[in-house]
Amino acid sequence: MCGIVGYIGQSDAFPVLIEGLKRLEYRGYDSAGVALIGNQDNLNVYKTKGKVSNLEAMAADKDCSGHIGIAHTRWATHGEPSAANAHPHVSMSGELALVHNGIIENYQVLKEQLADKGYTFKSSTDTEVLVQLIDHYYQQNGKDLVSAVCQALNDAIGAYAITVMEKKDPGHIVAARQSSPLVVGVGKDNKDFYIASDATPIVEHTNKVVYLEDGEIADIRVGEELNIINLEHASCSYTIKTVDLDISKLSKGGFDHYMLKEIYDQPNCLKDCMSGRLIVDKEHPENNHIVLSALRDYRDRLVNAKHIIIVACGTSWHAGLIGKQLIEKMCRKRVEVAYASEFRYADPVIEPEDVVIAISQSGETADTLAAIKLAKEKGALIFGIVNAVGSSIARETDTGVYIHVGPEIGVASTKAFTGQVTVLTLLALALGHEQGTLDDADYHEMIEELSEIPQKMEKVLEQAPMIKSLALMFTYAHNFLYLGRGMNFPVALEGALKLKEISYIHAEGYPAAEMKHGPIALVDQDMPIVFIATHHQLYEKIISNMQEVKSRNGRILAIVTEGDELVKNIADNEIEIPKTQNALIPLLSVVPLQLLAYYVAVDKGLDVDMPRNLAKSVTVE
């Protein structure tokens, strides 16, 4: 939930570090800091509560010289948000500086042991305990930093990604990871090295990266080949990978916020997601087909699986609920959808014949990563659906499909959700047809319909000005209720989540029929009720639910299929979406809800891209 940036090389470190932190702002944070070994071999540390821009302003008249440094954006886990608790932390000796992402679970025990040895602490963080522990071994072993890091990490219990540097050697930096992501970028001729929580701060400098694995330590020296060892000092082999990441996609592209850009990106993102996978022949629809290498490579395991478990968190979990309905309908397989955080501790029943589908935008979600490791131990096939290429989940899975929607910077997920649903649709269609539970006619028709979704999505986006006007009518609200049935129930959950994430308005999503089992007690003229009331097999039933709300003076905003006249006679306001197959409705019905949440939050003057208390990538439990 924090961002780490490190640099060592030929250039001035400070600009590299600050720009790197700005690239990581999307992850969420409450404070920022930087440490540099200056040209006079002095260790300079600057930290502040608030934005990276505050840190940049603070350091403007300070000594920011040097060719080595580490920097950090922090989300508070141990200790309140403050300059004192911000990273980097410096050892009591003043010789070491460290940044850390993760949680050291036994930090209190270690802190007491260090206090008995005379160490004192300036903060209430677990990170300061870790740097003092490294310093303890550093002073004992003749100031060998790598050995000290190995010894300290053998004592520590928990998750960590760390980068540490020593004042006496400005040509040396050490990084390590355990259950928290860390990437090393390798510059030309090993003259520059970059360290970061993900590749986004690195790619403008080099596209050559090494993804550290759990238990690995990177021993980095300028001008020498990267050396990676484990905690027992044994050498580890590694592969330098080439990252294909378009820098232009990391900008707002003329939009006011990343979130709005990413909402508008969705038609093109879905085209990218389906490119090379969805093969459409409009003249000969019988030739329509889907190409998924994961299905080709693991056909028998997927076809023969009787039980599929989808594990995910947040928005990805909502996508999983849609995936459940798609796979059960098209493949006639039993599908369970579990919160990864609950699944990993529930002693789940997993058989070797099962398939576990892990969904994560970042590919670094700690609970999802732990869940698939558990399932892997029990012999299940692990199928990943992730966005970030080369991420931890992508590397841990047996097979899978990248959603290929490009970097998602806004904390509130939009294009990743529709990308995940698209991939789940491709999987359900391809697997259902492969095993004979989906006939040729339906298969070919659905493929053509799916290929038209990007164009239909553009028609929804054309209504943004009208949705913006509607949003202005709802900023007064303190509570929202989102209701849908069938495929639109997960959309109701996602719409409610988007609103509460960025507007801080309490919102709940329910199956519309469950309204009578409690939520209807809340209905009055002050509570907006959002119905996703598109044409599908439960249309008449949701009309009945709407009439119940109307009779109690509830204010109804309805998402409807274009041309619908019945809902218009009941709802106070409506937003139309184009007609499509029932199974594809979520890809369209979610878009107006994304826009509604966005415009409500903007009208309230809130920070849409970095809402309070939220992190883009949840890399700790």
Question: Where do the PLM segments sit?
Answer:
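Conserved short alpha-helical segments that host acidic/polar catalytic motifs at enzyme active sites
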Residues: M1-K252, D256, K261, N268-H307, ...
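Structural beta-sheet core signal
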Residues: I4, L98, V164, A175, ...
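Glycine-rich oxoanion-binding loops at beta->alpha junctions
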Residues: G50, H67, A71-A84, D281-R299, ...
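Active-site phosphate/pyrophosphate-binding segments
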Residues: N154, Q266-L270, M274-I309, T399-P528, ...
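Glycine-rich, anion-gripping cofactor-binding loops and their flanking helix/strand elements
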Residues: L182-K188, D192-V209, T315, S341-A375, ...
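Generic C-terminus detector
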Residues: M259, R555, K568-I570, T580-E621
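Glycine-rich phosphate-binding loops that contact phosphosugars or nucleotide phosphates
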Residues: V303-E445, E449-E452, T534-N573, L596
